[in-house]
Amino acid sequence: MEENNQIVEKITRIVNPFIEEMNLSLVDVEYVQDGGYWYVRIFIENLNGDLNIEDCSKLSSKIEDKVEELIEHKFFLEVSSPGLERPLKKLEDYTRFIGEKITLHLKHKLDDKKQFKTIIKEVNGDNIIFLMDKKEVEIKFNEIRKANILFEFNDF
């Protein structure tokens, strides 16, 4: 697993200059094995509007050879939008999505639970304030294992 993390870091360093050049934002990089096949998944977004297939294709073309030099075995490269239930990876993501419903997974239990459906209320330094059961709960960013925007069909 440590080796996978190192590869993700190297892929991130490869991708970042192209992301900046294309005026996009990197959401996440995954290097995973699924069903016997290896995948490099790069999730990007356009902060100035909708991400289109041309952006994904263009980035894929720019980085493909460099990523192939890094990984010795066969893999599939996927470049896409993070989707409706995008992950929140950086502290800035929480600021950007204040007021949104999310699924929150903590590293340690809080009230005998690690998983919550909550709303981002505020970001205060390295702490995020969530609205849980009509109460404000402050949690340090480094106590969050993972979080995703919560898409509920009935919101429409």
UniProtKB/Swiss-Prot annotation:
Localization annotation: Cytoplasm
Gene3D superfamilies xrefs: Ribosome maturation factor RimP, C-terminal domain, RimP-like superfamily, N-terminal
The protein's name in its UniProt record: Ribosome maturation factor RimP
One GO cellular component term: cytosol
Organism: Fusobacterium nucleatum subsp. nucleatum (strain ATCC 25586 / DSM 15643 / BCRC 10681 / CIP 101130 / JCM 8532 / KCTC 2640 / LMG 13131 / VPI 4355)
Protein's job: Required for maturation of 30S ribosomal subunits.
Pfam families, sorted: DUF150_C, RimP_N
Disulfide bonds: none
Keywords: Cytoplasm, Ribosome biogenesis
Cell membrane recorded as keyword: no
Single GO BP term: translation
Membership in a protein family: Belongs to the RimP family.
